[in-house]
Swiss-Prot record:
Keywords: Carbohydrate metabolism, Cytoplasm, Hydrolase, Magnesium, Metal-binding. It comes from Ralstonia nicotianae (strain ATCC BAA-1114 / GMI1000). Mg(2+) 1 binds at residues 91, 113, 115. Pathway: Carbohydrate biosynthesis; gluconeogenesis. It is found in: Cytoplasm. One of its GO terms (molecular function) is fructose 1,6-bisphosphate 1-phosphatase activity. The gene is fbp1. The keyword Methyltransferase does not apply. One of its GO terms (biological process) is gluconeogenesis. This is Fructose-1,6-bisphosphatase class 1.
C-alpha cells in the first residue's frame, strides 16, 4: 500500500475536486507543521519543564497552563509570515491578531484553540489543537472583528490534532473527513483513514454526569432514558464515556460513533453554554457533519449560528445523527409544552 503524506493528499484533492487552492494548501501545511512542533513539546512534558500553570489567565478567566502559552506562540509564529493569512484569532487572546505590516497578507482567517483539554496535561490524558479557516470577506482591507463574524457554514477547512498514543491530524476541506498519523521517523503526517463516517446509531454517550442536577429538562430526559437501559423506553443499554477533553471525546466519536454533550446549565443562565463557538464548536461541527453526523445547540444547527462576538459560547450536542436528532426533538417538544 502506497503511503500518502499530507502534501500529496492536498495536491491530489485539488486536482480532483478543485477545492484547495495553493494558498489554502500552504496554510494547512503550516498549521500541520505547527501541530507537529506542539506535539513534540507535549511529548517531552516534565523533561522540558513545560508542565504546570503559567501563572496567568486568559480572556475566558481560565488559568493558563505553560503549554497553553507555548502552543499559542507556536501557531502565531508559524503562520504570521507565510502570506496566506490576513489575521488570526485564538481562544487564549482577547482580540484578534492582524498579520504585521512587514509580512504579506493573504485571503484567509485562521481561528484556533491552541491546546484543548489543557487541564489534563499534567495527568497525561490526550489533548489537542483545534483550528478553523475562513475567507477574509474583503481581502486587502484592514481587518476588523466583524470579518470573523461568519457562521460555520462559511468555513473552508477545519480540523484538529490529537496528542495521544499517536499524534493524529483530522482534516476536512468540505469533501469528507480524513485522518493522518504522524510518522515521527520521517516527520510527516501519513494518510491512515480516508472518508471517516460516524454510524447513525450508537450505544455510547459522553457527558459530565456530575452536572446532571443543573441541566435543562430535555437533556435530563435523554440521559435518564439512556441510563434506564433495556428496561427503559430505548430498549438497549448505553455506556458512558467522559474524558473532559473535547478533542479526545470527539475523536472517539469519529472513530466508533457516539454522542457528545456539553449542554447549557442553570448555574450560568445568562450564558448560552460553556464551549466556544468559533474555536471549538464550529470546527468540530464541520468535521462531524462531513462524517455523516449532526451538531446542534439543542435548538439550532451549530453551523448556522450567526456569531456576535469572537469569544461567544454555545451549548454543544454532536455525534451520531439519530441520537442528536432525538435530543433536538426533546428540546422542541419542551418548547411546545412550555
Amino acid at each position: 500500500m502506497k503511503r500518502i503524506n499530507l502534501t500529496r493528499y492536498l495536491i491530489e484533492e485539488q486536482r480532483e475536486h478543485n477545492t484547495i487552492p495553493a494558498e489554502l494548501r500552504l496554510l494547512l501545511e503550516v498549521v500541520a507543521r505547527a501541530c507537529k512542533a506542539i506535539s513534540h513539546s507535549v511529548n517531552k512534558g516534565a523533561l522540558a519543564g513545560v508542565l504546570g500553570s503559567a501563572g496567568t489567565g486568559n480572556v475566558q478567566g481560565e488559568t493558563q497552563q505553560k503549554l497553553d502559552v507555548i502552543a499559542n506562540e507556536v501557531l502565531l509564529e508559524a503562520n504570521e509570515y507565510g502570506g496566506n493569512l490576513a489575521a488570526m484569532a485564538s481562544e487564549e487572546m482577547e482580540s484578534f491578531y492582524e498579520i504585521p505590516h512587514r509580512y504579506p497578507k493573504g485571503e484567509y482567517l485562521l481561528l484556533f484553540d491552541p491546546l484543548d483539554g489543557s487541564s489534563n496535561i499534567d495527568v497525561n490524558v490526550s489533548i489537542g489543537t483545534i483550528f478553523s479557516v475562513l475567507h477574509m470577506p474583503k481581502p486587502g482591507q484592514t481587518v476588523t472583528e466583524a470579518d470573523f463574524m461568519q457562521p460555520g457554514v462559511r468555513q473552508v477547512a477545519a480540523g484538529y490534532a490529537v496528542y495521544g498514543p499517536q499524534t493524529t491530524l483530522v482534516l476536512t476541506v468540505g469533501n469528507g473527513v480524513h485522518m493522518f498519523t504522524l510518522d515521527r521517523e520521517v516527520g510527516s503526517f501519513i494518510l491512515t483513514n480516508r472518508d471517516v463516517k460516524i454510524p447513525a446509531d450508537t450505544k455510547e454517550f459522553a457527558i459530565n454526569m456530575s452536572n446532571m442536577r443543573h441541566w435543562a429538562p430535555p437533556v435530563r430526559r435523554y440521559i435518564d432514558e439512556c441510563l434506564a437501559g433495556t428496561e427503559g423506553p430505548r430498549g438497549k443499554d448505553f455506556n458512558m464515556r467522559w474524558i473532559a477533553s473535547m478533542v479526545a471525546d470527539v475523536h472517539r466519536i469519529l472513530t466508533r460513533g457516539g454522542i457528545f454533550m456539553y449542554p447549557w446549565d442553570k448555574r450560568e443562565p445568562g450564558k448560552a453554554g460553556k464551549l466556544r463557538l468559533m474555536y471549538e464548536a464550529n470546527p468540530m461541527a464541520f468535521l462531524v457533519e462531513q462524517a455523516g453526523g449532526a451538531a446542534t445547540n439543542g435548538h439550532q444547527r451549530i453551523l448556522e449560528i450567526q456569531p456576535e462576538k469572537l469569544h461567544q459560547r454555545v451549548a454543544v450536542i454532536l455525534g451520531s445523527k439519530n441520537e442528536v436528532d432525538r435530543v433536538t426533538q426533546y428540546h422542541r417538544e419542551a418548547q411546545q409544552t412550555a
